[in-house]
Amino acid sequence: ATPAPLDRRPLKPGKLTWKQLSLTRGENLLLKPHDLTLPQGQLGLLSGANGVGKSTLLQALCTLIPYQGKLSYAGQRPPHFFKQRWAKTVGLMLQEATAQFSCATVQEELALVSRNTLAPHYWTKERLAHAKQVLGLDELEPRSIYQLSGGQQQKLQFLSVLAMGQPVLLLDEPFANLDQASIQTCLTLLKDSCQAEQTAVLLISHQRVGITEHLDYELIFEDQTLKLGGNEN
């Protein structure tokens, strides 16, 4: 049975906007022209059947794949940015954790994030140390990333992406390999930073249990369109 869409809170204004955005895969139309602004300081769920184009949409918002229509952040479109500058605006957590690591060990990866975070006033060394501790990563710091379990790699990837501090954060199945306790820990870190930094967060998760109650709205991808789910409360 199709799960009931979560009731949404009133949407806040935002800076990442798309107008008449459409997507194709080969000759197949995935998304008909669509307009939306992602609200800042709120967490959204992007839901839909397998293969409908959810991951494709996130990649398009990062300008990693072609799209049709207009995409902008605070009125500036990606062609006006250096590609590196757009990457400092929109962060993406991929489904495959190992595709996203730059270093050999846990300690080196997190040190790289600490040096390069775009939100150093929030992601202080003390806050990053706390996040490492609650995720159980502190005791793994000397370890090779490639000796970690799938769940440990995903927690490291999650913290690395989160602590980079981009104002827009897109998460593709961030909790797929985690138990419920770890999911709740990640959600607490995500909510705290989202509210403090007024981050616009959109995540894909096939698992809804223990997740939807933390989210502010749901964006449903079906029939080649996107629509807000549920009733406003």
Question: Across the structure, where does each feature detected by a protein language model lie?
Answer:
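Helix-to-loop junction immediately C-terminal to a conserved catalytic motif
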Residues: 62
